[in-house]
Amino acid sequence: MTLYQIKPLFQSLLRPTMFWLYKHHVTANHITLAALALSLLTGLLLMLAAQPILFLLLPIVLFIRMALNALDGMLARECNQQTRLGAILNETGDVISDIALYLPFLFLPESNASLVILMLFCTILTEFCGLLAQTINGVRSYAGPFGKSDRALIFGLWGLAVAIYPQWMQWNNLLWSIASILLLWTAINRCRSVLLMSAEI
């Protein structure tokens, strides 16, 4: 069970916004680039300032990014805006945004740089394995337990927690370690889904 499974409900809430954007000639690629720009600017601010209180921004930005990601996909599918450029922007934008938003954790007190870098590597690996499924079987794998939406929830809550209770940063490295394990588990599950689907075919 992952947050990805409640995506249809989230999309239904966003559908009026999607129609408004379409009416005003906003394209899926515009939304994708806006999400990327927001992530890069937020990540840069968090890294340069390196103040725990600013991590209050993280859950807000992650929620906005999640909404923008849903909107760009809806515009592409439902408004006939699917393009090869859009697919490239979507996949690369997701990975770059993840790095931009989670790399600032490295600059928090009590954070072990190697653990944060390992976590980011596992994040990229997880997305690569999801894409690998699409390359082999034609269907992208969103297997959990620690997909993009789940990461946004957990890291957003942690950003909120350390902003309000800075003393909780003593647990940073435990969270990065657990996250890395869950990400590796997710990568394995996504590879397994490729093999299982291939066996069925």
Swiss-Prot record:
It is a multi-pass membrane protein. The keyword Cell membrane applies. Residues 65-84, 140-151, 197-201 are cytoplasmic. Residues 1-43, 108-116, 173-175 are periplasmic. One of its GO terms (biological process) is phospholipid biosynthetic process. One of its GO terms (molecular function) is phosphotransferase activity, for other substituted phosphate groups. InterPro entries: CDP-OH_P_trans, CDP-OH_PTrfase_TM_dom. Pfam families: CDP-OH_P_transf. This is Inner membrane protein YnbA. GO terms for cellular component: plasma membrane. The keyword Repressor does not apply. Its main location: membrane. It comes from Escherichia coli (strain K12). Keywords: Cell inner membrane, Cell membrane, Membrane, Transmembrane, Transmembrane helix. Signal peptide: none annotated. The chain crosses the membrane at residues 44-64, 85-107, 117-139, 152-172, 176-196. It is found in: Cell inner membrane.
